[in-house]
Amino acid sequence: MSEPNVRASFADNRRPLSKTKGQLLNMPPVITTALYTAFPVIFLLDKVLAFLTWTNDDPYTNFIAIAIYIMVVKYWTVVACTVLPTIIALGTCASLWFLKTTIDDLRSETAPPTIEEIIDTLINMQARFSYIVEPFSYFGSLSGSDYFNLGFSLIAITPCYIWLMTRIFTVRSFLLVFGVAWLSFHSSWSVATRHLLWRSIVIRKILTFTTGLKFSLVDKNIELTVLNDFQISNVGTGKTVEFHILQNQRRWLGVGWSNTLLPFERGPFTTEDLEKSWDSLESFQFPEITQATCRWRWLDANWKTDDSFAPGEGWIYYNNSWEEPSNTDSLTRFTRTKRWKRRALVIVEDDGTT
């Protein structure tokens, strides 16, 4: 009796059909064609950025890449003669196969990409690219003198670099450390390590000496991050905080100036960045500080008009769109703003104090 046929079933690894109706026909033909044609390139760039930022689905790929890099650099003499040609051949074949299968799958007529997929991929790629260039945004805020100090410091300590590379470190060890640091720069544990090292005053002093840039060398006992909107000064054992609140009014026909504003614009009483609002000055509440136990107390009895904001009664007048500020009122001015100020004392207490 013949044995029955044995069949093995494998999971279907093809990209599933989109359950959402394609919206390519709802777009202009030129934009649709451009997005559909460029989608494979966008998808591949998104995969590369995901690998560099450690935001891919399989983080073990990054560890494998780091392990291969360490092996190649550490055993370069052996690898260059024996394993390197095989690694190059296998890597090239794997890359070409991945590119071909990815492009064929994305351009498949049975499951074409939808506008939602293309836009989501573009948004992910933009976010990951912004995450990569975020460490370099610090250099955009430097002045001309900062760039001069940086260049002068790097040139001045160049002999130290040369001495370290020739006497203590080797080129192989430098490539090993630099390559691993670059490949793991955006990993979560690398970011956490840099944040912990940045808390050290010694590290900041070393960076100040080697780069010529000015870094904050003072560690505060408490981070009053919720008070960034207000002016803070140290007084005794506490901190004096000067709160600045903007009063916004609109002129209505037959009513005059009123705190009643349009629903889509700013509130009647807001912070200077317009992020927080209150109905009146009496409804203002102290910010909550979660970093330590604090006790608030007003230093001023009442709110006062900030004379430095505007002369006269302290109002700055705008047009209907809160633009074109002026110190004088006219028939074309329909909105105005006044700044109030009041000082308070926040005392940082220990956990054991009452």
From Swiss-Prot:
The chain crosses the membrane at residues 24-44, 63-83, 84-104, 151-171, 173-193. Keywords: Endoplasmic reticulum, Glycoprotein, Membrane, Peroxisome, Transmembrane, Transmembrane helix. GO terms for cellular component: endoplasmic reticulum membrane; peroxisomal membrane. Belongs to the PEX28-32 family. PEX30/31 subfamily. One of its GO terms (biological process) is peroxisome organization. Glycans are attached at N319. It is a multi-pass membrane protein. It comes from the Eukaryota. This is Peroxisomal membrane protein PEX32. Disruption phenotype: Results in severe peroxisomal defects, caused by reduced peroxisome-endoplasmic reticulum contact sites. Leads to defects in peroxisomal matrix protein import, membrane growth, as well as organelle proliferation, positioning and segregation. InterPro entries: Peroxin/Ferlin (IPR006614), Peroxisomal_PEX28-32 (IPR052646), TECPR1-like_DysF (IPR010482). SMART domains: DysFN. It comes from Ogataea parapolymorpha (strain ATCC 26012 / BCRC 20466 / JCM 22074 / NRRL Y-7560 / DL-1) (Yeast). It is found in: Peroxisome membrane; Endoplasmic reticulum membrane.
